[in-house]
A protein has these predicted regions:
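Conserved beta-propeller blade signature
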Residues: 2-3, 47-48, 93-95, 103, ...
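An edge-strand/N-cap motif at the start of beta-rich repeat modules
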Residues: 1-4, 16-18, 30-31
């Protein structure tokens, strides 16, 4: 199945082969909430997702646990709004809220295990950085510009590292190191054991979205807001240098570069889907769809590729053969399913 959240307030499960709706759940019935900003957590029988109404004063949010096959609500945990991914260590799951609170829930019934509030105001309604797990620890970068490490079981704070700048990407983990971008225009590598800075790389623009880690490399989207341009870069795990750069105008709208058959897939709000060779960044092909392309999903290296547009279309898209030339526009083999807008 293919799971997708609509910012019209419904969470869907599609048959990935036909696009037919297997089940859906309208979250409006549970209060003033509309959006799904984080990636779900999929277990053997459940799918967990957070909801929110941005920072609306009367808005709420939940963590939902749906039965993966039927869409039945197994449990839900109410809070002020959960726009982050859901992380997991064994029988405990973790998420963060717009109120800069990190909390842990029991996977079985959604009961609160522990909660840690940073106590930092969020006047600009920024999305919190999702918590990530490293072994039995949870890392979280708060709005107070501090990265903290917690014991996943007890919630005890183990260490903290003042960054002096805001995290602008999700944290990505390799071994015992956390990688992320900051509002100072840098990539950082920090030890998950004690918060020690292990590496730092200045960037030509602001890092954003989610970092892809593959082939001992990091692939990162950058945004130059002044010039309304975007970059896709590759660097190594030691952050010693930028290995290649690809520029786009307008900037990228998809959350992160998606790896597929050795290619990096990236979309923008002109409906352009681009494929770059991951080894050297050389463009391989591009195509034009309709809408602002926000999410790109794959099922391994197989086809089709699943693409969500902000205007409300989900595409099951068959890419051109790998031997096709750049800018081939002849493939219109996408099936569309209109189901509200996706962010």
């Amino acid at each position: 199945m293919l799971f997708i959240g609509s910012c019209a307030g419904t969470f869907y499960a599609f048959d990935k082969h036909t696009g037919q709706v297997r089940w859906g759940y309208n979250i409006h019935q549970d209060g003033n909430q509309t959006s799904f900003h984080g990636n779900p957590l999929i277990s053997e029988s459940l799918i967990l997702i957070g909801t929110d109404k941005s920072c609306a004063p009367d808005g709420i949010g939940h963590v939902y646990a749906f039965d993966k096959a039927t869409g039945a609500v197994r449990w839900k945990y109410r809070t002020v709004g959960v726009p982050t991914d859901i992380a997991q260590i064994g029988s405990v799951v973790y998420a963060a809220s717009f109120a800069d609170e990190l909390f842990a829930l029991n996977l079985e019934d959604g009961s609160l295990r522990w909660k840690f509030g940073m106590g930092t105001a969020n006047p600009d309604c920024e999305l919190p950085s999702p918590p990530v797990v490293v072994g039995k620890r949870v890392l979280y970068a708060g709005f107070d510009n501090v990265l903290r490490g917690f014991d996943g079981k007890s919630g005890r704070e183990l260490w903290q590292r003042s960054l002096g700048t805001h995290a602008t990407t999700r944290l990505s983990i390799v071994g015992k190191s956390a990688y992320f971008g900051t509002s100072a225009g840098r990539l950082l590598r920090i030890s998950a054991d004690d918060g020690r800075i292990q590496g730092e790389l200045p960037l030509p623009a602001l890092p954003e979205g989610r970092i892809l880690i593959a082939h001992d490399s990091l692939y990162v989207f950058l945004e130059d807001r002044e010039r309304r341009a975007g970059y896709l870069i590759r660097t190594n795990l030691t952050l010693s240098q930028i290995q290649w750069v690809q520029k786009s105008s307008p900037d990228w709208s998809s959350e992160w570069p998606r790896l597929w058959n050795g290619l990096l897939l990236a979309g923008n709000c002109h409906g352009e889907l681009n494929a770059f060779r991951s080894s050297d960044g050389v463009p391989q092909w591009s195509d034009k769809l309709k809408g602002c392309l926000r999410s790109i999903g794959t099922d391994g290296d197989g086809a089709p590729i699943y693409i969500g547009a902000q205007e409300g279309t989900v595409y099951a898209y068959s890419p051109p053969p790998l031997t096709s030339r750049l800018d081939s526009r002849s493939h219109e083999r996408a099936t569309e399913q209109q189901q509200g807008s996706k962010r």
